[in-house]
């Protein structure tokens, strides 16, 4: 079943789960309950969507059970849902809403109040966008609505209406680490095929229990953290934020979760709070979104956990490659998922690797509101593939500096301060230089960093002067996006200041 709603019904028919989704607020729902409640909510939602035509519906909510119900209610209505990153600020949010032609946004007064988001909501409302609050929907609920929903429930279970699988199921937005966010429309087919690719690669059984704290607006949070387990018949525990570093290891242990997805930045933050039995039930710890440092691999190995590093982009729904228990090379991001074609284009002045292009049924063919289609998607990543088919990310094409005519990978340079100060975050940026075109500046949270000692170490490691940072800046707290990635745009502003 390709359509998300068809898949949900099919899974419930052949594998009832009493608690398919739970959350930290003690909410839970079975898969049959998820179908019924999404129908009930969807029917009432139509009363609020006045003159909405076929516009996407915005969703601005955290990782809780009601968010999953809202999401599947839009799929029941065969509407496109656009998931808004509420951490990205009013400028980015209004830009995303405009690109997606959104009129209505579903949210909750309780969430707005607890998140201190009233100023944000006010700014968005001033631009004529309308909010639909879950509390208002609940007030409209009547006994008649419940009876109609029961009738529709059985009609959908046994005589599902024909749904369009070619249209966008969801709109997500690129993280905007290097430029303004782009709208990415993922069709039901995109999401279906990527789900099948991941299941085939990782061989995940229906007995697994997922712990998902990456947000719905994150492509891994939604696609791999929610849709994959729910539509495969696995249980999932939702947690509203990955930023509760002290709490999350304890909840993973308490919920007996067996699958956990995260990023290197967050995994580092959890380390001080991991106990002997924290991961005793964990079968899969998969990291993506950014390169996993060797020091992170080493620390988790001490806790008896092998980090399976993977790679993906929102435009690929999102998974492209992953290390598995059987096929694993540290430092790589694993082998390509089944049925993904790739090609590597040589780049002038680059000594190693090339620019990665991909295509497949999980990959988009154009961005939102852009009529120009592409046969191959340009990932913007410089990569190499070894003789065994393992993929290595060498860096972003935009994260290279041209110094004295030579292309220098900022990601490659970062490996050395990370080795020198393994317990700290270090990011290299490029700044203009009158002599050599560009120069490197290191930003780190290492207190009292000694640039001379670092450069001496890097020289001993065999690097030429072109690879040595010219300046160093201390930054106590690094800007991190809601997706768990470091905000390179803000760091570049700091470097230039």
Placement of each model-derived feature along the sequence:
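Conserved AMP-binding/adenylation subdomain of ANL enzymes
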Residues: 192-209, 217-258, 273
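Conserved pre-ATP/AMP-binding loop-to-beta segment of ANL
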Residues: 16-17, 131-173, 179-180, 203-209
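Conserved AMP-binding/adenylate-forming
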Residues: 42-88, 213-215, 407
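Conserved ATP/PPi-binding loop(s) of AMP-dependent carboxylate-activating enzymes
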Residues: 329-339, 347-375, 406-408
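Gly/Ser/Thr-rich phosphate-binding loop
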Residues: 146-150, 257-262, 271-329, 341
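Conserved AMP-binding A3 loop
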Residues: 28-32, 169-193
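AMP-binding/adenylate-forming catalytic core of the ANL superfamily
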Residues: 105, 360, 366, 382-467, ...
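AMP-binding/adenylate-forming catalytic domain of the ANL superfamily
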Residues: 134-135, 438, 462-486
């Amino acid at each position: 079943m390709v359509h998300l709603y068809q898949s949900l019904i099919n899974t419930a028919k052949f594998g009832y789960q009493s608690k398919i989704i739970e959350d930290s607020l003690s909410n839970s729902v079975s898969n049959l309950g998820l179908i019924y409640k999404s129908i009930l909510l969807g029917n009432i939602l139509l009363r609020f969507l006045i003159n909405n035509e076929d516009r996407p519906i915005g969703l601005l909510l955290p990782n809780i059970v009601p968010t999953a119900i809202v999401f599947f209610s839009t799929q029941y209505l065969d509407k496109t849902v656009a998931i808004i990153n509420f951490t990205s600020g009013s400028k980015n949010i209004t830009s995303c809403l405009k690109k997606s032609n959104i009129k209505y946004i579903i949210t909750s007064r309780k969430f707005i109040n607890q998140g201190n988001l009233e100023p944000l909501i006010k700014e968005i409302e001033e631009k004529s966008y309308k909010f639909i609050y879950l509390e208002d929907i609940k007030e409209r609920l009547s006994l008649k609505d419940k009876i109609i929903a029961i009738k529709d429930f059985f009609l959908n279970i046994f005589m599902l209406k024909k749904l369009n699988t070619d249209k966008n199921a969801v709109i997500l937005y690129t993280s905007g680490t290097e430029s303004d966010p782009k709208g990415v429309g993922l069709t039901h087919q995109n999401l279906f095929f990527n789900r099948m690719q991941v299941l085939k690669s990782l061989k995940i059984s229906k007995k697994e229990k997922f712990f998902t704290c990456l947000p719905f607006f994150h492509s891994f949070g939604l696609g791999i953290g929610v849709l994959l387990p729910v539509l495969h018949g696995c249980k999932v525990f939702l947690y509203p934020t990955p930023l509760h570093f002290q709490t999350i290891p304890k909840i993973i242990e308490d919920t007996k979760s067996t699958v956990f997805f995260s990023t290197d930045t967050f995994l580092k933050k959890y380390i001080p709070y991991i106990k002997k039995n924290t991961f005793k039930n964990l079968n899969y710890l998969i990291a993506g979104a950014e390169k996993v440092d060797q020091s992170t691999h080493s620390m988790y190995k001490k806790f008896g956990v092998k980090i399976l590093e993977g790679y993906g982009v929102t435009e690929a729904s999102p998974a492209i490659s992953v290390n598995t228990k059987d096929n694993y090379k540290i430092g790589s991001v694993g082998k390509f998922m089944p049925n993904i074609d790739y090609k590597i284009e040589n780049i002038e002045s680059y000594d190693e690797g090339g620019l990665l292009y991909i295509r497949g049924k999980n990959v988009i063919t154009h961005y939102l509101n852009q009529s120009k289609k592409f046969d191959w998607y340009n990932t913007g990543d410089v990569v190499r593939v070894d003789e065994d088919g393992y993929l290595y990310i060498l860096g972003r094409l935009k994260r290279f500096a041209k110094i004295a005519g030579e292309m220098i990978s900022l990601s490659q340079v970062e490996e050395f301060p990370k080795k020198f100060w393994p317990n700290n975050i270090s990011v290299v940026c490029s700044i203009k230089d009158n002599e050599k075109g560009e120069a490197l500046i290191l930003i780190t949270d290492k207190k009292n960093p000694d640039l001379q000692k670092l450069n001496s170490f890097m020289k001993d490691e065999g690097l030429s002067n072109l690879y040595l940072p010219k300046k160093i800046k201390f930054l106590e707290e690094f800007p991190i996006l809601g997706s768990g990635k470091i905000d390179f745009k803000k760091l570049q502003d700091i470097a230039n200041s």
